[in-house]
């Protein structure tokens, strides 16, 4: 049996401000740092250990992983950073407040932008400063790989080569992986692992800073999965994620 641990980054500054973040590089709030520290405590107390780590190239995930490894006394572990684990690119919505968008366009439209499988948000113009082609960390990406926006379907298409080429071979060889990433890149992995349908994935809400444990068989099929921590607290955090796209009352 293999164990895979997934952790969404701790609360970011734009999570707190309820903005669409996507590939915008924002840091963690004090609460986000505390969430990551608590996640490290849960993993340590649960007896989890790791051989290698994976994260995105966005600061909030990298910072979360650093806090996790500090708490686990494993700062020396090898870390691979990949743009393929980045958050979904929210295109022209990046930086905009979700509740304000719900008030302007309606909660149903914002739900479609946030949670539908194959409907992308408005695309960025390549001249827009938010376009990733203007960021040196993506200098090696081809024009086809640089998103102007992404649906979850697009995010799945980006993440799955990383699963097949990097993650699955490592897990199959016995490597214990710790992955610190983002709500939608993790939803892409969860959709694949649990064979969740295109419509049903809209109900999957991954809370910040809570370890999600997968127990996998020899063929890397899930035997079980569960969150570490108090079940009611985890459910409240997941419900808060679902409510982010509602207009303020």
Swiss-Prot record:
This protein's UniProt keywords: Gluconeogenesis, Glycolysis, Isomerase
Q: What pathway does this protein act in?
A: Carbohydrate degradation; glycolysis; pyruvate from D-glyceraldehyde 3-phosphate: step 3/5
Matching InterPro entries, A to Z? His_Pase_superF_clade-1, His_PPase_superfam, PG/BPGM_mutase_AS, Phosphogly_mut1
First-tier enzyme category under EC: isomerase
The residues annotated as the active site are 9 (tele-phosphohistidine intermediate), 87 (proton donor/acceptor)
Q: Which PROSITE patterns match?
A: PG_MUTASE
Entries under Gene3D superfamilies matching the protein: Phosphoglycerate mutase-like
The protein's name is 2,3-bisphosphoglycerate-dependent phosphoglycerate mutase
The scientific name of the source species is: Solidesulfovibrio magneticus (strain ATCC 700980 / DSM 13731 / RS-1) (Desulfovibrio magneticus)
